[in-house]
Amino acid sequence: MEDAPMHVVIPDDFQDAVRGLDCFKRLTGHRVTVFHDSVRNLETLAHRFADADALVLIRERTKITDALLKRLPRLRLISQTGRGVAHIDIEACRRQGIAVAVGSGSPIAPAELTWALVMAAMRHIPQEVSALRSGGWQTRLGVALRGRTLGIWGYGRIGALVAGYGRAFGMEVLVHGRQGSLERASADGFAFTADRGELLETADVLSLHLKLNRATRGLVTAADLGRMKTTSLLVNTSRAELIEKDALVAAPRAG
C-alpha cells in the first residue's frame, strides 16, 4: 500500500528556483505549494500553512514559533535546507510531535559571497560601475589587500575558506574564536588570538562567521566597533543579530 500524498509547503522562494532543482522531482506525486515572498504576520502564515503536512524551509526568514505551530494541526515535518535552526522553536516542535530535519549546507556560496563583498568594498566596484555608466572614469583609488590584516571571527567551514582566500591575496590572517577554532586555525598555519581586543584593533578587514544562538546574539557591541580602525571594513554574512541592535549606528556617531 502506497503512502498517501503529502501537502508540502515551501516559503521564501524569492527567485522561483526550487522547481528547477533536480531534488524537486522527488516531490512528484505530492501536492506542493511554493510561496515567492516572505511574510511575518501570524495570521497570514497560519493561513498559508494550515493544511501543510511538511514545511521545507530554504531560508531562515520565516520564524516557526510556538504560537504558529499551535495553528498547524496537520504539520508533522519541518525540513531546513541549512544547518541553522535559530528561527525554529525546537521545544515547541518536540511538544507537538513535529520532526525537524536539517541539511549539512554548503560553505562555498557564503564564503565566495563574503569575498566578493570584500573586493567590492575595498576596490569601490559598485561606485565605479555607477560612475562609468554615467560617463565618469576612475573616480577614486582602491585599497590593496596584500599586506593588510584579515580578521576571522569564528573558524568553522566558512571562516576557514575565507581565511584561505585572504592568504591567496597575500593578507595576514588573524583568527579569533573558541578553543576549537584556534586549534584548527593553528593546524592550518594561521595566526590566532584569544584576545578579542587584539582582533578588533588589528584587523583591516573583519569578517564574522559565527552561528546565531543565545550566547552570540548581540555579541558584537558598539564598544567593540569603536575599537576598530576608522578605515577598517566589517563584513557580516552570518546573521545580522550577531551585532548589538543600533551598534552600527552608534559607533560611527561616537567617532
Please tell me what each predicted stretch does.
Residues 17, 38-45, 61-66, 87, ...:
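Structural motif corresponding to alpha-helix initiation and N-cap regions
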Residues 128-161, 170:
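Glycine-rich NAD(P)-binding loop of Rossmann-like domains
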Residues 51-129, 133, 142-143:
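Phosphate/diphosphate ligand-binding glycine-rich loop within oxidoreductases
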Residues 13-16, 37-40, 59-63, 82-85, ...:
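Short beta->alpha connector loops
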